[in-house]
UniProtKB/Swiss-Prot annotation:
Transmembrane segments: none
SUBUNIT field: Homodimer.
The protein's name: D-cysteine desulfhydrase 1, mitochondrial
Top-level taxon: Eukaryota
Originating species: Oryza sativa subsp. japonica
Protein's cellular compartments: Mitochondrion
Family named by the database record: Belongs to the ACC deaminase/D-cysteine desulfhydrase family.
Catalyzed chemical reaction(s): D-cysteine + H2O = hydrogen sulfide + pyruvate + NH4(+) + H(+)
Recorded name of the encoding gene: DCD1
Lineage: Eukaryota, Viridiplantae, Streptophyta, Embryophyta, Tracheophyta
Amino acid sequence: MARGAHQAPGGFWTVAAAPTRCSLPHSLPIPLHAAAAAAAWMAGVSAASAAGKIGSFLSKRPYAPPSWASHLSPAPSQTFSLGHFPTPIHKWNLPNLPNGTEVWIKRDDISGMQLSGNKVRKLEFLMADAVAQGADCVITVGGIQSNHCRATAVAAKYINLDCYLILRTSKLLVDKDPGLVGNLLVERLVGAHIDLVSKEEYGKIGSVALADLLKKKLLEEGRKPYVIPVGGSNSLGTWGYIEAIREIEHQIQISGDVQFDDIVVACGSGGTIAGLALGSKLSSLKAKVHAFSVCDDPGYFHSYVQDLIDGLHSDLRSHDLVNIENAKGLGYAMNTAEELKFVKDIATATGIVLDPVYSGKAAYGMLKDMGANPAKWEGRKILFVHTGGLLGLYDKVDELSSLSGSWRRMDLEESVPRKDGTGKMF
């Protein structure tokens, strides 16, 4: 869909301005007052030609930070257009909310198809830096069904770079073909080079040393590798969600009648919550950020987020910016039957499909906390950030099969007369 303006089904206005990073695009599928809608529509129409310019997608462009983040350094000077932004915000009619509580959802799961989810925002800055440094390939590390690794593989091929992935799996599978399930299918289709390590090897050596080993090997072969950390989470990648806060700010300005008290998001590597928390504090948003960690523990993430904030030469403190709660359950990428049933029930009730590794656990943790501490959430407007990861569901097919919708053989009588449709097949 072009980044212009149209009236969506149900009387919602979706308005988008030119996708320049210095003047961020606007989009909010929220009912607008008539005058505001008309003004926003005119602005969208005037910008539509620039937004829909052939070749603007996948292009590199100059970047200037939001005014409220201009003191942070180092600040990126360029970014790639890799995602379909702005992503919409709409009301999420979750069941059993506390009195007066509203939950809205930021749909970063639809920032693209092969290249979707929260990792795209980080990669827009990281890939621009890789190209600026003259890289001809990128290296990154993750789990066997890593959304970040899949997004990195696709983004690299978009801009003509090779991609090397170090994927963590069980010691029983490390010497076997990893297959074509979920994210692996996309990674292998786009030609990513995959090296497997066991969880034990990963724990002993660590992601940084593993990436350095592969980098050294590639340098010896005459390649020019650029290392992207786990989840794209470093100080440069943090700018992805600082920029997302500017996007949300503009969407709120267009709406004129929605203000968010809280932002809720999953946390798996720390960069997304660092950008959201820092941006929310510095901008006009001022929403409290609540992160539900799906691995490690809150203490680790507070320390890591603090390192990212320090890396941008800010004197703000992680504990003042974000509340981090443990939602890892059985462990990273592992689910209880109750968690998977929750994912299925939410999809059935609202049409929103959550991934089982990140947003599914975050939403589960959020609603569980609302049930246990309703007064904490009563009367508040919450923005839940859906970070994508839909392909991760394919790794849970066996576990979900007993929970999925029923089917039946259609009961037909032999006497039913034929009526031809369109085409020979019908």
